[in-house]
Amino acid sequence: MSKVIGIDLGTTNSAVAVLEGGQPKIITNPEGARTTPSVVSFKNGEIQVGEVAKRQAITNPDTIASIKRHIGEAGYKVTVGDKSYTPQEVSAMILQYIKKFAEDYLGEEVTEAVITVPAYFNDSQRQATKDAGKIAGLDVKRIINEPTASALAYGLDKTETDEKVLVYDLGGGTFDVSVLELGDGVFQVLSTNGDTRLGGDDFDEAIMNWLVENFKSDNGIDLSKDKMAMQRLKDAAEKAKKDLSGVTSTQISLPFISAGENGPLHLEMTLSRTEFDRLTSDLVDRTKAPVMNALKDAGLDANEIDKVILNGGSTRIPAVQEAVKNWTGKEPDHSINPDEAVALGAAVQGGVISGDVKDVVLLDVTPLSLGIETMGGVFTKLIDRNTTIPTSKAQTFSTAADNQPAVDIHVLQGERPMAADNKTLGRFQLTDIPAAPRGVPQIEVKFDIDKNGIVNVSAKDLGTNKEQKITIKSNSGLSDEEIDRMMKEAQENEEADTKRKEEVDLKNDVDQLIFQTDKTLKELEGKVSDEELQKAKDAKEELVKAQQENNLEDMKTKRDALSEIVQELTVKLYQQAQEAQQAAGGAEGNATDAKTDDGTVDGDFEEVKDDKE
């Protein structure tokens, strides 16, 4: 069975890992980095992903970042030129890039993956993530929650002990907290909570707003209206945030950020950690309620938690670490890298699926309650939040009016008492109900949630056994046909990218060969015949002509022809050098013989061995 890779598809950064020798290992990207920016840019018809795309963000308006914040969002599209892309398509570009360099590392095709999502993602967001994987050419074997993945990475070699673990996961765009029980190889999620609109991006924004306000106060210019200046501010804010995890103050210096009446203006400000903590205290405080709710739902007090694991790059912020310590009474565990733990845990789950990891069982939960709308617009729950999945639950309902021929089933997810305040997952209708007084027909509504947290709902008239089913699709509205079309486009893009790379490699080869030929011909002057030199020069000129005309097929043919001629000449050069060396060696030998004839006597010697040996 081929390897099942584990992918942490993050808001700001993504990572990929694979199980090797029973241990998960991060796969580095082509730049040698262990994480890859979740950024996509479009330039001259080419799609670029990762660090190269992030570097263009200031100058290239066709750059997309933090697309995960919109995945599963109905109707949301990003327009680039004359084309629009759904969040699934953009996410698929990131996944496709990750898939490619994972294949390069493993030396084999990768078709299966485990992808992580924030624990508090709803059904639409989970389904959309799965769709993104499919578009990228991946069979997503399992969707698992990010905090659960972290716990898998932490607890893989600790299966002998029983521990209650709280995972605090503050990433680039989302926040989750989960409480798990670990023991005998079973990883059971007791509860989960979070905020899908809170993350490191918000901390960056707080610094950006502070910079904008101060610059406006000093210079009377509002930088928020200058797109290029704002991108520079964003980069500087992110860097300052990271710096303040290690130092107590940092200098933010952005020359030529704007221009005033008297010429260019420069931004020079010092941000202290104290000021940063003041600017972001409300963001840190927003994470407290989910922590307390997760503990409450798990039926535990903070003092019953054995370990606190921090996950996500934003947990490096000292104020965050201090707050978690105060709320839980525990010093957070730093044994796993917060940027890599999720991908490592996903790789462990991949190993469970492929059979490489034995005796590990993962029991996850549904993050939000599921139910239907009933009379009066009330949300009636069938499955409560934090129920272990996979699970199934049925409940019987009846008609609201006499002789009602059909019932509309409105499927919802959320915690609010009224249907209108919760997230609609789907609607379907059960028809042909026999005429009967109100309350007589028996309609059984059944919910099934699979191990990925994806929902199936059925409604059955118990009198006639007529049944209607629905698999809840992503609210992004992607049909199977659209997904197939996007898969095809993604494949075409990959083929086009491969072709472009081959073109660049060919041009580089040609440049290198022309340079090498000039150098070799100079060395060969006077050492080979003029006829041979001219043959090489003519072949080189033909290649230069093909290069100038940008004729790729001609370039290949002429490159191969010139390469062969140069190789033959180089071999000749080496042969000549060798012959000269041998001739010199022969002359030296003759000189030695002559010396011996002059009366030098060769002496015999006998090796004397030491008796002590």
Swiss-Prot record:
Gene3D superfamilies for the chain: 1.20.1270.10, 3.30.420.40, Actin, Chain A, domain 4 (3.90.640.10), Substrate Binding Domain Of DNAk, Chain A, domain 1 (2.60.34.10)
Molecular function, one GO term: unfolded protein binding
Functional summary from the UniProt entry: Acts as a chaperone.
Record-stated family: Belongs to the heat shock protein 70 family.
Domain of life (superkingdom): Bacteria
Reported induction: By stress conditions e.g. heat shock.
Statement: the UniProt record of this protein carries the keyword Zinc-finger: no
Upper taxonomic lineage: Bacteria, Bacillati, Bacillota, Bacilli, Lactobacillales
Listed name of the protein: Chaperone protein DnaK
Database matches in InterPro entries: ATPase_NBD, Chaperone_DnaK, Heat_shock_70_CS, HSP70_C_sf, HSP70_peptide-bd_sf, Hsp_70_fam
Sequence ranges of Acidic residues compositional bias: 599-613
This protein's UniProt keywords: ATP-binding, Chaperone, Nucleotide-binding, Phosphoprotein, Stress response
Modified residues (Phosphothreonine): T174
HAMAP family the UniProt entry points to: DnaK (MF_00332)
Region (Disordered): 577-613
